[in-house]
Amino acid sequence: ASLYASTAAYYLALASKGAERAHYAGLAKKAAYFALSWYYTWDVPFAPGQMLGDIGLKTRGWGNVSVENNHIDVFIFDFADVLRWLSKEYNEPRFADFAAVISSSMRQLLPYEGHQCGIAKKGYYPEVVQHTNWDYGKNGKGYYNHIFAPGWVVASLWELLSPGRPEEFIGR
């Protein structure tokens, strides 16, 4: 929810001026700080033989999705844009620095020839990345889940890899 709140306040700040803009910018900042508390600042150790460890996955910069199922995934959408904007708005480089960490982390599992990330299908990007012992009953720690939601996964990566789109669109 905090990711959505920070993004919504960011959009409203972009569309506002004066005191109203400052108000929404402040809300975006508060929500972003809370959202960042769900992002990994370290790399989860994987045992030898676990696929994610074998391919060298680094969890730093990935978001922990929920307390219920405790997996990481690419759920980012415009949040990196929010962080870069907050960095400029408040002269706080830590926001942009962590946006860069998130961006590099999300790119790790983009499959291309010679780098299939343990997946046999070109173009597949997993929705659920199991970094803990909890899972939905398929695979477990160190593996991907078989569940795949291509719509939002593609949309999220599209936004991540298209920096500045909201500012360009709302600024028209």
Q: Which residues does each predicted region cover?
A:
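Short coil/turn connectors between adjacent alpha-helices in alpha-solenoid helical repeat scaffolds
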Residues: 16-19
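Aromatic-lined, polymer-binding surfaces characteristic
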Residues: 1-6, 52
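Terminal, non-catalytic domain-edge segments
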Residues: 11, 23-42, 53-172
